[in-house]
């Protein structure tokens, strides 16, 4: 009898496959609930169920799902982290960031930064900053640090901080200095030279203590500015009247979600390159740079700036000369968005929290437009949508020049 019962229990793979092919929201909810009842201690079952329910826009049920996962797996951090990210993605910023901080604080600084934060003055936990000095400490990737630079101004203007220092990774130092958002910018490699402050704080901690409404964020953009570094000549000499579009199609392959966020090949965008009146300028570095260089040799309207760009400030100078930046979710999307440049971001079905759920705009970057890969869809459908909008922009620019 025990053997027969065991045979009647579907495998995890069969359970999740059935969930993926649910034909309606109600069927998906029923199958998901059955899946977590059958495998109540398997985190990946909760995770897959949450993704499938998101397809059907059932965020309320996802709330309960992650709460159940936390209860079932009290000793694991991933349920708490994903519950926090879900809240942030929904727009519940303070609640989500508080949950996130409670989770990340378990691990200490090693999971967040490369250099230990100061031990000689305290971490900020929401105390009054009126007349105080504070350090925003380097955390996670370049895109994260660019995104959170906006909070230097927030700590001064809303919280009353008298002096704000930003400690960041080496590639960002000159770019951040040019922005003048912080009173001082220090390379994290030189953190030992940091003078005493009243407090230090990780960037992700700030919204846990400073209430923010997603639809009423403090004006911040632009908070990056192009440096005096001259943009590449091929960009400056582009014919008058053409639409100049920057392109980034891959992120760093070491990123945990890179398989979903990066395009498999530049060829995915081939339909765009056939448009007349549009010149494309690759800002690609690292992975994908060789492919971009090959395209530049084959197409007269595709130019590879990768070899001309050696720093983030040079990237910003190039972005300043473009009409539009078309990019996957990389640090360049944050550079362009923070500069107030029209930025079109290609996103996977399940994107990073800062792009939130289902939005086509970004409260954080008012000039950004989001092109999401639809659930069960592929990149060519996204590119077809982009092509239509690019054609409109190209025609508008040509008419403006003719006038």
Language-model segments: residues:
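Catalytic machinery of carbohydrate-active enzymes
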Residues: 10-403
């Amino acid at each position: 009898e025990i053997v027969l019962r065991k045979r009647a229990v579907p495998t995890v793979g069969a359970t999740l496959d059935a969930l993926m092919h649910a034909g309606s929201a109600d069927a998906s909810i029923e199958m998901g609930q059955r899946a977590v009842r059958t495998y109540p201690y398997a985190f990946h079952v909760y995770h897959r169920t949450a993704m499938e329910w998101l397809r059907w826009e059932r965020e309320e049920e996802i709330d309960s799902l992650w709460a159940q996962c936390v209860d079932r797996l009290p000793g694991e951090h991933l349920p708490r982290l994903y519950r926090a990210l879900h809240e942030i993605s929904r727009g519940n910023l303070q609640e989500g960031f508080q949950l996130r901080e409670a989770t990340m604080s378990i691990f200490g600084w090693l999971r967040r930064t490369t250099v230990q934060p100061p031990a000689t003055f305290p971490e900020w936990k929401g105390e009054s900053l009126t007349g105080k000095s504070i350090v925003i400490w380097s955390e996670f990737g370049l895109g994260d640090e660019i995104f959170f630079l906006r909070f230097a101004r927030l700590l001064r203007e809303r919280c009353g901080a008298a002096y704000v220092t930003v400690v960041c990774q080496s590639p960002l130092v000159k770019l951040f200095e040019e922005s003048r958002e912080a009173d001082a910018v220090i390379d994290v490699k030189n953190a030992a030279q940091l003078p005493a402050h009243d407090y230090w704080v990780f960037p992700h901690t700030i919204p846990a203590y400073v209430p923010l409404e997603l639809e009423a964020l403090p004006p911040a953009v632009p908070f990056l500015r192009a440096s005096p570094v001259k943009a590449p000549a091929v960009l400056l000499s582009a014919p008058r009247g053409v639409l100049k579009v920057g392109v980034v199609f891959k992120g760093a392959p070491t990123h945990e979600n890179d398989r979903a966020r990066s395009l498999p090949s530049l060829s995915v965008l081939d339909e765009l390159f056939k448009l007349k009146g549009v010149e494309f300028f690759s800002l690609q570095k690292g992975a994908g740079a060789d492919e971009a260089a090959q395209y530049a040799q084959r197409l007269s309207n595709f130019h590879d700036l990768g070899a001309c760009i050696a720093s983030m400030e040079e990237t910003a100078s190039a972005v300043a000369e473009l009409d539009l930046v078309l990019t996957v979710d990389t640090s360049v999307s944050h550079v362009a968005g923070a500069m107030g440049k029209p930025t079109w971001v290609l996103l996977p079905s399940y994107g990073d929290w800062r792009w939130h759920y289902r939005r086509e705009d970004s409260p954080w970057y008012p000039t950004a437009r989001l092109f999401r890969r639809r659930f069960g869809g592929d990149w060519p459908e996204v590119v077809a949508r982009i092509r239509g909008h690019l054609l409109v922009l190209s025609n508008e620019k040509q008419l403006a020049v003719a006038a």
